[in-house]
Amino acid sequence: MASKIETLKANLEAALGARVVSLTEAIGELTLVVKASDYLEVAKMLRDDPKLRFEQLLDLCGVDYQTFGDGAYDGPRFAAVSHLLSVTNNWRLRLRAFAPDDDLPIVASLVDIWTSANWYEREAFDLYGIVFEGHPDLRRILTDYGFIGHPFRKDFPVSGYVEMRYDPEEKRVVYQPVTIEPREITPRVIREDRYGGLKH
């Protein structure tokens, strides 16, 4: 008897055919990668196909692969990643679509298929600059409306470009260029043999 993941994998391959760019398993969950041009059609099939029935979109986020794998990665920079749930079949799926243009990343909006994608797509637009084509209200959701740039992109400086301060003369909050010096953030290395001052 086939396992639940094997059954889901077979159902996905049968339903989607050549639209599957890759289908991999890791940590007990399947990841389906599709082209941006097939993203919307595949999402509809995932929801409507009686052997799949992914009724819920649980999460959607953007990913910037610019420095992925210590720079060894050589593919599209931005992806939209969704996590789907089939309540009917009790299985989950990760759906990934890479935006073909790194300078202006665009993928289709999933709001018409799963309304829960609305604010998730706004967040990915705000933080990564991924444009979700067909979104009914694609505007910033976490940063200021006048914010310049997208703060979760790998090339965005940790200190940002501007800072806010209250100006007592103008009696309002004003923006000014950052006054702190950019610095390299070095990860802390924990030496296990001397951790907490203990010698092993």
Swiss-Prot record:
Catalytically driven reaction(s): a quinone + NADH + 5 H(+)(in) = a quinol + NAD(+) + 4 H(+)(out)
Pfam families, per database record: Complex1_30kDa (PF00329)
Membrane topology: Peripheral membrane protein
Alphabetical UniProt keywords: Cell inner membrane, Cell membrane, Membrane, NAD, Quinone, Translocase, Transport, Ubiquinone
Coiled-coil zones: none
Record EC number: 7.1.1.-
GO molecular function: NADH dehydrogenase (ubiquinone) activity; NADH:ubiquinone reductase (non-electrogenic) activity; quinone binding
Localization in the cell: Cell inner membrane
Signal sequence region: none
Gene3D superfamilies the UniProt entry points to: NADH:ubiquinone oxidoreductase, 30kDa subunit
Similarity annotation: Belongs to the complex I 30 kDa subunit family.
Function as written in the Swiss-Prot or TrEMBL entry: NDH-1 shuttles electrons from NADH, via FMN and iron-sulfur (Fe-S) centers, to quinones in the respiratory chain. The immediate electron acceptor for the enzyme in this species is believed to be ubiquinone. Couples the redox reaction to proton translocation (for every two electrons transferred, four hydrogen ions are translocated across the cytoplasmic membrane), and thus conserves the redox energy in a proton gradient.
Oligomer status and interactors: NDH-1 is composed of 14 different subunits. Subunits NuoB, C, D, E, F, and G constitute the peripheral sector of the complex.
Protein name in UniProt: NADH-quinone oxidoreductase subunit C
